[in-house]
Regions:
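Gly/Ser/Thr-rich loops at beta-strand to alpha-helix junctions
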Residues: 47-48, 146-157, 180-181, 244-247, ...
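Ligand-binding beta-strand-loop-alpha-helix segment within the catalytic cores
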Residues: 99-109, 168-245
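HTH-adjacent hinge/linker in prokaryotic transcriptional regulators
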Residues: 60-142, 159, 165-166, 184
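Gly/Ser/Thr-rich active-site loops/lids in small-molecule metabolic enzymes
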Residues: 253-282
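ATP/nucleoside-binding phosphotransfer catalytic cores, i.e., glycine-rich phosphate-binding loops
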Residues: 9-17, 32, 52, 76-77, ...
Length: 348
């Protein structure tokens, strides 16, 4: 296939350019549907006149429907869109970028989706879909315990989970941390419940605050139900989690001004599992959290990290210096370009 594409690029470059353009239009309609022509033209940076001709072609081929509510992708269009993904990624250089990024970060695998989630919110949805596929490939055992962390990216991950995900497997989704006091929709408990409801699988909850003082932590740890919940979470054979911007996460946790001043002074850029990292990957602050700890990752065979957007590049870089080598990163072009163009040497 790659040889054929190389030949086509030399003999029929115009044909490939048209195919790429129509793929981008189809892709944009799929993620924004139902979408009007004016909105779509703005998203693609294309004039309405040029776009009109292209969408009429796609409609004539039965790939999209056009209604008063906007344009949507048909079942046939979705098949074509999925079939073209690999080819388009090769043409755009994404496969090469994925390999270089995995080597740079010294992790198992990187998957890069087109776009920048900072600019185009639905790129996050595509990252979620790719993460779901990677989790599906990882869960080869008959029985699996999957830990899921909280956050808006994980909420999107849950939304992209198909109803038939279990496929005969016994799956138990567990929250990687407590969550009382956090935005309900983005709590790990809520996300696990949503996934289990969609897929007809089981889930457990951790109804404790994510952050605890030492005395409260030790008191709760004496409770048998709490001990059992933590043992279950720590038995996970797969985990899906995000990476946060340091200051954003600190403010979301209602962190004191004193601690915010500290992590700012120590140049923290990324956060995961309550650990705050600077650009060199050094831990500059740690919050006592209830649930999985960073060191627990060493015992988990399958680790999928979902984080994207140009603004997250520094956070991703800082975290990956300490990430286990079996980590799979799902990101977007915005973050990938910043990481590849801004780095001259290995990160670890």
């Amino acid at each position: 296939m790659s040889d054929l594409i190389n030949i086509q690029q030399k003999l029929l470059p115009d044909v490939l350019a048209v195919m790429q353009k129509r793929y981008q239009i189809l892709r944009s309609i799929y993620f924004a549907e139902p979408v009007g022509r004016r909105t779509l033209a703005g998203m693609l940076g294309m004039s309405e006149r040029v776009l009109r001709g292209e969408v009429e072609f796609l409609k004539a081929q039965g790939l999209i429907d056009i209604a008063s509510s906007g344009m949507t992708v048909t079942k046939e269009g979705l098949i074509v869109f999925r079939d073209l993904e690999g080819i388009m990624n090769q043409l755009s250089g994404l496969h090469s970028a994925e390999n270089r990024l995995a080597e740079l970060l010294q992790i198992k695998k990187c998957l890069v989706v087109q776009g920048d989630s900072d600019i185009t919110p639905w790129v996050r949805e595509e990252m979620g879909r790719v993460a779901v596929k990677q989790l599906d490939l990882a869960l080869v055992e008959k029985r699996n315990v999957v830990a899921v962390m909280g956050g808006s990216t994980m909420a999107t991950f849950a939304d992209t989970m198909p109803s038939d995900f279990a496929k005969g497997r016994e799956l138990l989704f567990v929250p990687g941390r407590g969550g009382i006091g956090e935005d309900l929709d983005n709590q790990a408990n809520t996300i696990c419940d949503r996934i289990a409801t969609k897929t007809g699988t089981k889930h457990r909850v951790l109804y404790v605050p994510e952050q605890l003082g030492e005395e409260a932590y030790q008191s709760l740890m004496k409770e048998p139900a709490i001990q059992e919940g933590l043992r279950l979470v720590q038995s996970a054979n797969a985990i899906v989690h995000g990476i946060g911007d340091a200051l954003t996460m600190a403010k979301r946790r209602h962190t004191s001004d004193e601690v915010i001043e500290k992590i700012t002074r120590l140049s923290a850029v990324g956060e995961a599992f309550g650990y705050y990292f600077n650009e060199q990957g050094e831990v500059v602050h740690k919050v006592s959290t209830f649930g999985l700890q960073f060191e627990d990752l060493a015992k988990i065979p399958h680790i999928i990290v979902v984080a994207g957007g140009t603004s997250k590049a520094k956070a991703i870089k800082s975290y990956m210096k300490s990430a286990p080598e079996n980590t799979i990163l799902v990101t977007d072009e915005g973050a990938a370009n910043m990481l590849l163009n801004g780095s001259k040497a290995h990160l670890k």
